[in-house]
Amino acid sequence: MKANEIRDLTTAEIEQKVKSLKEELFNLRFQLATGQLENTARIREVRKAIARMKTVIREREIAANK
């Protein structure tokens, strides 16, 4: 999901997606530890997506304080 697509969502929707991505990241790390993970690049993709969403949330917080 691109940053522009994330900006179209409400803050509550973004927070919900962050929560689900964190759960997915936990599961991916668990699979990695047990040797079941085939696509290791997915961990990086999920981490980057979480960072993008948190960045948009922070941008909104800063804009609201001005």
From Swiss-Prot:
SUPFAM superfamilies: Ribosomal protein L29 (L29p). Belongs to the universal ribosomal protein uL29 family. Part of the 50S ribosomal subunit. GO terms for cellular component: cytosolic large ribosomal subunit. It comes from Bacillus subtilis (strain 168). The lineage of its organism: Bacteria, Bacillati, Bacillota, Bacilli, Bacillales. PROSITE patterns: RIBOSOMAL_L29. HAMAP family: Ribosomal_uL29. The keyword Ribonucleoprotein applies. PANTHER family: 60S RIBOSOMAL PROTEIN L35/50S RIBOSOMAL PROTEIN L29, LARGE RIBOSOMAL SUBUNIT PROTEIN UL29C. Keywords: Ribonucleoprotein, Ribosomal protein. The keyword Transferase does not apply. One of its GO terms (biological process) is translation. InterPro entries: Ribosomal_protein_uL29, Ribosomal_uL29, Ribosomal_uL29_CS, Ribosomal_uL29_sf. GO terms for molecular function: structural constituent of ribosome. This is Large ribosomal subunit protein uL29. It comes from the Bacteria.
